[in-house]
Amino acid sequence: MARIAGVDLPRDKRVEIALTYIYGIGRSRSNEILAKAGVNPDTRVKDLTEEEVSRLREIIDKEYKVEGDLRKEVAMNIKRLMDIGCYRGIRHKRGLPVRGQRTRTNARTRKGPRKTVAKKKK
């Protein structure tokens, strides 16, 4: 099993797909990396040579922010928004949608399960 950026890539998948298991790498970035490394995207991970794996590892380490570093950067960006108290930061703090979606109905993913309020008795 090839290990790149601290992630074990699945052996039976194509390299193009297997690279997407790394946080911060999607299909287009995966193809970009494979082109730079000169590796055929249709190759299975188990068929990669040690040299190809080391080339992929080197390219990813040098040129891309992935896994822990990327997660940390995203978390710091959100924390910065919350600290400066801007609108987006406040929405993050309150656990509400940040990008202008309606909240009168829907928005259940961000708000979590319903908290039912009892009706007033007469």
From Swiss-Prot:
A single GO molecular function term of this UniProt record: rRNA binding
SUPFAM superfamilies with a match to the protein in the record: S13-like H2TH domain
One of the protein's GO biological processes: translation
Disordered, as annotated region: 95-122
Keyword Lyase in record: no
Keywords: Ribonucleoprotein, Ribosomal protein, RNA-binding, rRNA-binding, tRNA-binding
Pfam families linked: Ribosomal_S13
Superkingdom field: Bacteria
Family label: Belongs to the universal ribosomal protein uS13 family.
HAMAP family in the record: Ribosomal_uS13 (MF_01315)
Protein name, per record: Small ribosomal subunit protein uS13
Source organism (scientific name): Thermoanaerobacter pseudethanolicus (strain ATCC 33223 / 39E)
This protein's encoding gene: rpsM
